[in-house]
């Protein structure tokens, strides 16, 4: 029997239009980011061409925000396919510059000499392994201006919030209906597997930063 192996990236981009919060940026998330971008525009005395904005991935909400504000959007993604496919979700299309590569490897030559005011990464901490955090932050540090912002939106566990995997699956059966489990109840599954007081990530600061 031939094994059919899918690409998890395809699942995300193909179902993006069906996601809801927390799986995609909410209006309040975007309002917060917009405020930070406007601060940078003010810093440059209204010259939007000086604002450098990088998305790790191809998140359409962030690209749309750039179009709304009239600034160039750099996207750095594993696959050009993701960038092209999600372009259909971008209503206010900005000027875009795409670079293909891996955030956890050496920074591609196209970006090596760039410095950004704002770097966004939608749920990046949820899709990389704990041992890769150090490399991610090192690369982000190299790409950020000294007063730049890195905002990796992620799932948050509320204080004292508890869920079981059974509750997560029940929610999926009641609401998900044939949608991929992870894309529908991913956050709930993360919370259900969290070990109170044990699961945490510590990233060492080093001279390399």
Please state what every model-predicted region is.
Residues 104-119:
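A short acidic, Gly/Pro-enriched loop at the edge of an enzyme's catalytic core
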Residues 1-48:
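Class I SAM-dependent methyltransferase Rossmann-like catalytic core
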Residues 149-190:
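Conserved class I S-adenosyl-L-methionine
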Residues 50-107:
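Class I SAM-dependent methyltransferase SAM/SAH-binding core
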């Amino acid at each position: 029997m031939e094994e059919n192996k899918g690409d998890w990236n395809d699942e995300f981009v193909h179902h993006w239009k069906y996601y809801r919060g927390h799986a995609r940026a909410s209006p309040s998330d975007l309002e917060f980011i917009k405020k930070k971008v406007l601060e940078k525009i003010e810093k440059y005395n209204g010259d939007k061409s000086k604002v450098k904005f990088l998305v790790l991935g191809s998140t359409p909400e962030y690209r749309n925000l750039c179009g709304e504000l009239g600034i160039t959007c750099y996207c750095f993604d594993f696959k050009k396919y993701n960038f092209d496919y999600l372009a259909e979700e971008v209503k206010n299309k900005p000027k875009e510059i795409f670079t293909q590569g891996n955030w956890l490897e050496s920074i591609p030559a196209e970006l090596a000499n760039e410095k950004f005011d704002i770097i966004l990464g939608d749920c990046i901490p949820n899709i990389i392994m704990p041992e890769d955090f150090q490399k991610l932050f090192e690369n982000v540090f190299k790409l950020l201006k000294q007063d730049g912002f890195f905002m990796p939106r992620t799932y948050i566990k509320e204080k004292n919030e508890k869920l079981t995997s059974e509750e997560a699956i029940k929610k999926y059966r009641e609401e998900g209906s044939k949608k991929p489990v992870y894309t529908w109840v991913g956050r709930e599954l993360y919370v259900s597997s969290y070990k109170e007081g044990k699961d945490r990530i510590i990233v060492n600061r080093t001279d390399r930063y």
